[in-house]
């Protein structure tokens, strides 16, 4: 059992570290954000389907019509969630876009009392207020240090965060479907929805991306999305909910480190302080004596 837990942690950490490097590879793909998102979904869907076939697992749809409709809606949201996040990378630094995006758990925390009649504790209220203050720091410092482009990037990052939060809330009400099956269906719906959008907005120019661009697109689809999500969902069965929630913060930490130390993007003191407040208080909300009843999980959005 101990070996299985150790192996699960290694798979989870590997997936999270990979997710944190997405911005670096996206920067090397000379295509429109919506086209990158579309081909990411296509490649990842093929990889996940192959993974399920190798494991001898049959693809199963949700038993109820309501769950199927919710899954299809969340799949459409994932497509535009990816587009918003990739556009955010274009307008601002990877670190600022990521920190804005990781406001999603705070949105979920605020929405749960309204949707699920869950009462917020004093600790949750404090964490919500401090995380929001951190976001204000990121936004205000972005406007001061990077101009309107930075603020636009934060806006797209928050738009992606709202969609991410909606998908998390939808997934909270879904039962009876495997995590990998759920993600595969969401990706398939996402690419179907994105196809006409890409066709009419920018068209398809993947063959003009060059060898380097296509190689980075393949890495994004195969490694970051296909293999990454297979590793992630395969690890959950042997991890406690709180362990998985805590390990998920490797993703934004790696993303910020890549942004500053590898990509050479600047991060101001106020942005760093705001980022610490967002991630720190969101993580603090996950910690405690009890395992969270609804641990934050990956939903195909990273």
Question: Where are each of the predicted segments found?
Answer:
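Glycine-/small-residue-enriched transmembrane alpha-helix faces in small-molecule transporters
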Residues: 1-44, 76, 84, 146-173, ...
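Hydrophobic/small/kink-forming positions within alpha-helical transmembrane segments
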Residues: 20, 49, 75, 79, ...
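Hydrophobic/aromatic residues within transmembrane alpha-helices
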Residues: 29, 36, 40, 88, ...
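Hydrophobic transmembrane alpha-helices of multi-pass small-molecule transport proteins
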Residues: 48, 52, 72, 120-142, ...
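Membrane-interface interhelical linkers
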Residues: 1-17, 46-73, 119-125, 143-152, ...
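Specific alpha-helical transmembrane segments that line the substrate/conduction pathway
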Residues: 35, 42-46, 86-117, 160, ...
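Hydrophobic residues within alpha-helical transmembrane segments
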Residues: 10, 14, 39-43, 73-76, ...
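Helix-helix packing/entry segments at the starts of transmembrane helices
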Residues: 97-103, 170-191, 225-261
């Amino acid at each position: 059992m101990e070996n299985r837990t150790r192996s699960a942690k290694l798979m989870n950490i590997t997936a999270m570290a990979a997710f944190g490097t997405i911005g670096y590879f996206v920067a090397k793909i000379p295509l429109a954000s919506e086209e990158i998102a579309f081909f990411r979904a296509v490649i990842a869907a093929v990889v996940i389907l192959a993974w399920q076939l190798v494991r001898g697992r049959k693809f199963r749809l949700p038993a109820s019509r309501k769950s199927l409709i919710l899954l299809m809606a969340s799949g459409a949201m994932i497509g535009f969630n990816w587009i918003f996040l990739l556009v955010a990378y274009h307008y601002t630094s990877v670190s600022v876009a990521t920190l804005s995006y990781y406001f999603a758990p705070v949105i979920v925390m605020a929405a749960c009392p309204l949707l699920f009649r869950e009462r917020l504790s004093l600790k949750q209220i404090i964490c919500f207020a401090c995380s929001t203050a951190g976001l204000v720091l990121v936004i205000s410092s972005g406007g001061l240090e990077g101009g309107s482009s930075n603020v636009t990037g934060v806006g797209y990052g928050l738009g992606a965060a709202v969609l991410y939060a909606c998908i998390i809330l939808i997934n909270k009400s879904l039962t009876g479907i495997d995590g990998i099956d759920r993600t595969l269906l969401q990706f398939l719906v996402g690419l179907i929805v994105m196809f006409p959008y890409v066709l009419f907005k920018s068209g398809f120019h993947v063959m003009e991306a060059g060898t380097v661009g296509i190689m980075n697109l393949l890495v994004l689809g195969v490694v970051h999305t296909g293999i990454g999500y297979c590793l992630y969902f395969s690890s959950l069965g042997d991890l406690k909910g709180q362990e998985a929630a805590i390990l998920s913060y490797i993703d934004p930490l790696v993303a910020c480190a890549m942004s500053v130390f590898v990509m050479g993007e600047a991060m101001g003191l106020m942005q760093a302080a705001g980022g610490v407040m967002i991630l720190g208080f969101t993580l603090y909300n996950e910690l405690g004596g009890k395992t969270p009843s609804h641990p934050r999980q990956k939903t195909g959005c990273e």
